[in-house]
């Protein structure tokens, strides 16, 4: 016998093994299950194992084991025919959740008998689970699916290969220890426990947690469980295999031992079944004759219709061809299983449509089809009250059409359109009646419609497609709001029609000549707000799933698919299918934004994404539905859900945090444990673990195809992890704990789950595979959340071991020559918003960051810096804009990849020769600074993916500034430099974490080289136009993002040549200064701008004119009273230096009433502010006496500083200021004396005199304020008699006379001058 001896009725299941159909043995009424297993892709070992399974099954004859009736194979496939059992025990669990103990006991008795039979025949099932237990007629339990079964020889004791379902696996299996037949007994215990309780004894979504529970945790038994039942389960669920209940004691246990009545009933049932089977076999001959006879007289006359003779002739010829038929298909149930409509013509048409040839005959005859459609049209047009009598005929017509569609018997476009219209009208009429009796018909009609609208000849979408679309949308909008039990299948099929049609539209829009109908459909989708209704479908599905029902699960999956296809198609439409050219590629090939098309999303797409994002954020039910789509491990909905969530993350900055389970009100700088179990991020990591385990266990003939599907899951899962991590990073969140939780074990598991999908170091692929590239990207993106190699983080112990070796990473970064010697592009078709090399370069940057100085030196020695420079240069052949569009992502670096590349180069600067190779070479600097050009910045800003937009522009500019600032940081950080010892210095923010800081501590030779080449470097900066580039960058950034650019300006201002260039290029433009000195500016920006003003003022009086024109005095005045003491101090310092060289600003200071505020700062509680205020007062009095009257009030404040200040420099500034107050006139001399300032100066001299006369080796008198105090007294006594008289009469005058003997020359000199002036000596 062969497959030709069976009718194939319908598909009942499928999996990696193949497909299972419901069938019927010809000429009998025997219903069978037919399992088809393809040989393609299977090894000889696999085929041998399949034959072994068949042989095992063939020998088994038991009432509780599915019986194999037949088997055969050809060159392409195996077919195993078994008895047909109606449902799975799994379905009972889904519907009823749990069963009463009496029913569980009845099932247990049958399963025990089945296992007793198997084990007595030395066969281990090895995959006991509810899905492999079927329920046949009379509630007879049938054990099936022996794909993992293994026959043991008489010498076999234990086996070691691991198979089975984790939930039902015994402890010895999960521990990969030897096992025997008792593993089946453990699985039996788990199944019975689940039937009674509602879930297995150990249940969790995490494979690792599940294994831990199975091995270590005790089983908890419900209190209401009977003693016998609990005793039986304890005997089975014993973690020690040798202590489990086994044969023969098992079959004699009171819980499963059969009573005499049960034995007798079983024997009677077996006899009846055997007799029925024999009767069916004996009836073959007669049944065959009847079937042939019926086929010959297939169609009777229909008096009211013309043209049937032609149909009848065709039918008869079809019968001749089909005796016996050699090809069957999946359609509606057989004629024996359905109720006839009473229309003989339709009966015979349906009978003929059941064979492929017969269906083709009907499909080629328009008149026959008109007969079939007539009842559908009549039903659609009749009033509701008259439709009841048309139902049977309409349903029969539907079955006929289903058969025709299943065999693709209808090829005419016109007929397809006609049938589709009729079906949609019929379905719409059924939906409008809102009658539960049609709940089984509507989904069947929609299913057939879906097949029709999905089958469009060629690439053309006909004008009628828009009519079909609008009707499908109308139907979907009606049914999606149905909440009655049993409507889940209807909503699913309606949603599936939407998905199918959108998929066809997407395909059309990607063609070279898209049809206008496709665009009309997108416009209608927008106007009808179909995405809102799809979100409603998700919400309804989530509500149903939350209540414990799974009827809406398929609808949720299909809604996810439909939403994503709609969004993706809208973006394709907006871009007119322009390839997303990466900004770096466009820059290197001199393409403008116009040349590369629009790299943003588009208004319709943004609107759709916004709708979905809002629905997800607001509705817990929508979140539940999408979560179930992820959890199903079915490729299409899972990938759609991942892409949808990834896209929403790019649209809304809240969503990435939400997917990690972070509190919505969490401050950016606060670090908490994210990615805990139950979050979406946790589920994504579980998918990666699932893919790893599945790829190891996969042994079927479809291995290549299965591996491809797993790689696709890995690809999209890793891209989502990367997107979430990058979004968190771009919003300022910096910690891997946000995604990996605070558990070190989870750090290990999750990072390893990603790393497992990166090819091992000993296997370097000729080209980087997409899933491997995305795994690299995910790992790099997560590691980038850590700012530095913190020893306290468990990640630091994992990072270096997980990152591939540098040789492998660098291999993929090298140009790939083609056969003709030209360099070919990286990643022509990788991902829409990522570069193929992003992950590779990101891991290289992580290795440099985490690997320490040794890693840096090794990579430098291997030529990595030059490799990175060449990568940025895009060492590719010149290409036209058209060629670039054909091969997108030529260099393979997205904006984030570019940032990581620059960062990697920056890390290499601390390793010796790289500084001269990169920063002192003008060609290299031109290449790097080109990334700061308006052209590139605009390209990055318009980039729609991660690393684009305003955040991407900020990151791009900042990383290049870090690179350019390296020499400045290195020199400022060396011991003894002013900036190294200052608490707040110019551009200090750039010093934090910079490799330049390490240079002064680790490499004195490099520091010396930088000092030698600094002048050359400054020349290069000027030649490539860095000062003007940085100034233009300020215009591209938001105020909050100006910290690092302004810090770099502050560092450059410290070099005179750069300062001159900056000022000439508009650094001090009034509008710019107004913006930067605004109260809303970041604190660091304000401090650095104040420092810039101060440094320029101190450097050269030529800058006074530009500073004056910059209108900075008003903000300086305001900052004198700022709450931040550092800002007050910087403001005082700037004002002091603005008065350093001359009195240019004196009148302006008076006009803005600044002097009074400066005097108040002399009493500031902040030491630095007090010091710089005294300095500013002194300079305000130095050049002339214009401000003396305003400064009169400062005398008392300065005198107080001399007695209360803690820092000697502050006292020195106060003493110098007092001297300047009498330098230009005697206006303030009397106040100096009367207010005690002169006496305070004398007291200061007296207090410091002891040290001056006897200086120690560690501390000299020149470091005290004594010198300035003596200098001030000398000036006062030289010019003003009142001062001389006061000093001469003071009891402290002898102290000054003694200081003439000081070993410090200046002190002795000033003391001598004072004594001489006071004593009247020349």
Curated annotation (Swiss-Prot):
Question: Record's InterPro entries?
Answer: ARM-like (IPR011989), ARM-type_fold (IPR016024), Armadillo (IPR000225), Kinase-like_dom_sf (IPR011009), Prot_kinase_dom (IPR000719), Protein_kinase_ATP_BS (IPR017441), Ser/Thr_kinase_AS (IPR008271)
Q: Which GO terms describe its biological process?
A: cytokinesis by cell plate formation; embryo sac cellularization; male meiosis cytokinesis
Query: Where does it live in the cell?
Result: Cytoplasm, Cytoskeleton, Phragmoplast
**Protein kinase domain spans which residues?**
6-256
**Per UniProt, where does ATP bind?**
12-20, 35
Write down what this protein is called: Serine/threonine-protein kinase TIO
Q: What does the record say about tissue specificity? A: Ubiquitous.
Q: Which UniProt keywords apply?
A: ATP-binding, Cytoplasm, Cytoskeleton, Kinase, Nucleotide-binding, Repeat, Serine/threonine-protein kinase, Transferase
Q: Does the keyword Manganese apply?
A: no
Give this protein's Gene Ontology molecular function annotations: ATP binding; kinesin binding; protein serine kinase activity; protein serine/threonine kinase activity
State the GO CC annotations.
cytoskeleton; phragmoplast
């Amino acid at each position: 016998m062969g497959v030709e001896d069976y009718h194939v009725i319908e598909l009942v299941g499928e999996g990696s093994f193949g497909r299972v159909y419901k069938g019927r043995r010809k000429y009998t009424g025997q219903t069978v299950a037919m399992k088809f297993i393809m040989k393609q892709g299977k090894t000889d070992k696999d085929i041998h194992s399949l034959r072994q399974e068949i042989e095992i099954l063939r020998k088994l004859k038991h009432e509780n084991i599915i019986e194999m009736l037949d088997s055969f194979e050809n060159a392409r496939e195996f077919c195993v025919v078994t008895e047909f059992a109606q449902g799975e025990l799994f379905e009972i669990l889904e519907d009823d959740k749990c069963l009463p103990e009496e029913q569980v006991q009845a099932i247990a008795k049958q399963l025990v008998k089945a296992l007793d039979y198997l084990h007595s025949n030395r066969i281990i099932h090895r995959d006991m689970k509810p899905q492999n237990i079927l329920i046949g007629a009379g509630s007879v339990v049938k054990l099936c699916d022996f794909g993992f079964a293994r026959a043991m020889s008489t010498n076999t004791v234990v086996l070691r290969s691991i198979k089975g379902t984790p939930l039902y696996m015994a402890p010895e299996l999960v521990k990969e220890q030897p096992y025997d037949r008792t593993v089946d007994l453990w699985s039996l215990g788990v199944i019975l426990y689940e039937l009674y309780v509602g879930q297995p004894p150990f249940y969790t979504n995490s494979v690792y947690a599940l294994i831990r529970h199975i091995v270590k945790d005790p089983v908890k038994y419900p209190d209401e469980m009977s003693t016998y039942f609990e005793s039986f389960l304890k005997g089975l669920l014993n973690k020690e295999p040798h202590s489990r209940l086994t044969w023969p004691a098992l079959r004699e246990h009171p819980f499963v031992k059969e009573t005499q009545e049960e034995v007798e009933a079983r024997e009677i049932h077996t006899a009846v079944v055997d007799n029925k089977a024999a009767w069916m076999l004996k009836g073959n001959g007669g049944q065959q004759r009847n079937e042939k006879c019926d086929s010959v007289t297939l169609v009777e006359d229909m008096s009211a219709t013309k043209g049937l003779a032609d149909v009848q002739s065709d039918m008869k010829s079809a019968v001749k061809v089909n005796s016996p038929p050699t090809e069957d298909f999946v359609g509606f149930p057989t004629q024996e299983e359905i109720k006839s409509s009473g229309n003989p013509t339709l009966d015979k048409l349906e009978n003929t449509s059941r064979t492929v040839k017969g269906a083709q005959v009907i499909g080629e005859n328009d008149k026959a089809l008109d007969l079939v459609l007539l009842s559908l049209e009549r039903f659609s047009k009749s009033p509701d009250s008259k439709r009841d009598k048309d139902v049977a005929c309409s349903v029969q017509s539907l079955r006929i059409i289903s058969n025709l569609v299943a065999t693709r018997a209808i090829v005419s476009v016109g007929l397809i359109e006609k049938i589709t219209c009729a079906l949609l009208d019929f379905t719409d009429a059924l939906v409008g009646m809102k009658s539960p009796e049609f709940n089984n018909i509507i989904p069947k009609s929609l299913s057939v419609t879906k097949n029709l609208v999905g089958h469009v000849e060629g690439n053309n979408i006909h004008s009628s497609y828009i009519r079909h679309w609008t009707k499908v949308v109308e139907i979907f909008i009606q049914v999606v709001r149905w909440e009655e039990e049993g409507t889940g299948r209807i909503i699913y099929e309606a949603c599936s029609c939407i998905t199918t049609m959108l998929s066809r539209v997407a395909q059309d829009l990607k063609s070279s000549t898209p049809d206008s109908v496709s665009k009309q459909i997108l416009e209608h989708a927008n106007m009808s707000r179909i995405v809102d209704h799809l979100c409603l479908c998700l919400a309804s599905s989530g509500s149903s799933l939350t209540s414990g029902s799974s009827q809406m699960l398929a609808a949720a999956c299909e809604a996810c698919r439909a939403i994503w296809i709609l969004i993706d198609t809208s973006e394709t439409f907006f871009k007119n299918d322009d390839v997303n050219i990466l900004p770096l590629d466009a820059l290197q090939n001199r393409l403008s934004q116009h040349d590369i098309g629009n790299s943003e999303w588009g208004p319709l797409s943004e609107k759709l994404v916004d709708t979905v994002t809002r629905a997800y954020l607001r509705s817990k039910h929508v979140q539940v539905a999408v979560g179930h789509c992820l959890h199903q491990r079915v490729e299409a909905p899972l990938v759609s859900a991942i892409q949808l969530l990834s896209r929403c993350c790019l649209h809304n900055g809240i969503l990435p945090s939400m997917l990690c389970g972070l509190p919505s009100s969490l401050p950016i700088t606060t670090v908490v444990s994210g990615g805990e179990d139950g979050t979406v991020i946790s589920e994504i990591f579980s998918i990666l673990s699932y893919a790893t385990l599945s790829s190891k266990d996969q042994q079927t003939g479809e291995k290549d195809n299965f591996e491809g599907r797993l790689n696709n899951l890995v690809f999209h899962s890793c891209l989502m992890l990367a997107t979430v991590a990058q979004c968190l990073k771009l919003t300022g969140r910096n910690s891997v704990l946000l995604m990996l939780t605070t558990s070190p074990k989870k750090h290990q598991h999750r990072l390893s789950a990603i790393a497992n999908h990166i090819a091992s170091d000993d296997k370097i692929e000729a080209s980087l595979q997409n899933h491997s590239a995305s795994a690299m990207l995910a790992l790099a993106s997560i590691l980038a959340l850590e700012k530095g190699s913190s020893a306290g983080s468990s990640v630091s112990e994992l990072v270096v071991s997980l990152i591939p070796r540098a040789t492998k990473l660098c291999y993929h970064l090298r140009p790939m020559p083609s056969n003709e010697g030209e360099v070919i592009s990286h990643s022509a078709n990788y991902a829409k918003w990522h570069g193929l090399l992003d992950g590779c370069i990101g891991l290289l940057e992580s290795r440099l960051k985490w690997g320490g100085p040794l890693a840096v030196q090794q990579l430098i020695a291997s030529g990595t810096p030059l490799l990175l420079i060449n990568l940025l240069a895009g060492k590719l052949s010149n290409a036209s804009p058209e060629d670039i569009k054909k091969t997108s992502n030529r260099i393979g670096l997205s904006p984030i990849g570019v940032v990581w590349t620059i960062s990697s180069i920056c890390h290499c600067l601390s390793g010796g020769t790289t500084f001269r190779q990169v920063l002192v070479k003008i060609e290299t600097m031109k290449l790097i600074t080109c990334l700061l050009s308006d052209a590139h910045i605009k390209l990055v800003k318009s980039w729609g993916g991660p690393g684009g937009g305003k955040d991407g522009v900020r990151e791009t500019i900042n990383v290049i500034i870090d690179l350019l600032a390296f020499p400045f940081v290195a020199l400022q950080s060396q011991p003894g430099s002013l900036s190294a010892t200052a608490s707040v210095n110019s551009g200090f923010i750039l010093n934090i974490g910079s490799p330049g800081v390490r240079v002064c501590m680790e490499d004195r030779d490099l520091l010396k080289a930088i000092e030698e080449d600094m002048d050359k470097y400054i020349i290069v900066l000027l030649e490539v136009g860095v000062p003007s580039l940085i100034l233009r960058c300020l215009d591209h950034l938001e105020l909050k993002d100006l910290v690092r650019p302004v810090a770099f300006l502050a560092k450059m201002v410290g070099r005179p040549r750069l300062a001159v260039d900056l000022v000439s290029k508009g650094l001090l433009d009034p509008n710019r200064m107004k913006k930067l000195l605004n109260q809303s500016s970041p604190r660091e920006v304000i401090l650095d701008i104040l420092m810039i003003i101060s440094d320029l003022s101190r450097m050269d009086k030529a800058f006074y004119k530009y500073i004056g024109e910059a209108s900075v005095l008003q903000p300086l005045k305001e900052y004198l009273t700022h709450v931040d003491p550092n800002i007050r101090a910087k403001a005082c310092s700037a004002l002091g230096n603005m008065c350093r060289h001359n009195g240019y600003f004196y009148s302006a200071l008076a006009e803005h009433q600044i002097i009074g505020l400066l005097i108040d700062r002399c009493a500031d509680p902040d030491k630095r502010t007090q010091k710089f205020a005294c300095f500013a007062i002194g300079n305000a009095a130095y050049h002339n006496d214009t401000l003396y009257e305003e400064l009169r009030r400062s005398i008392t404040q300065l005198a107080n500083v001399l007695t209360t200040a803690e820092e000697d420099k502050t006292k020195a500034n106060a003493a110098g200021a007092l001297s300047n107050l009498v330098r230009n006139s005697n206006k303030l001399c009397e106040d100096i004396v009367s207010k005690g300032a002169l006496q305070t100066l004398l007291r200061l001299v007296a207090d410091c005199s002891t040290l001056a006369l006897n200086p120690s080796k560690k501390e000299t008198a020149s470091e005290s304020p004594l010198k300035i105090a003596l200098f001030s007294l000398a000036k006062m006594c030289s010019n003003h008699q009142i001062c001389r008289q006061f000093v001469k009469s003071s009891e402290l005058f002898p102290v000054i006379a003694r200081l003439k003997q000081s070993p410090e020359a200046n002190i002795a000199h000033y003391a001598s001058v004072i004594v001489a002036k006071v004593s009247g000596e020349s």
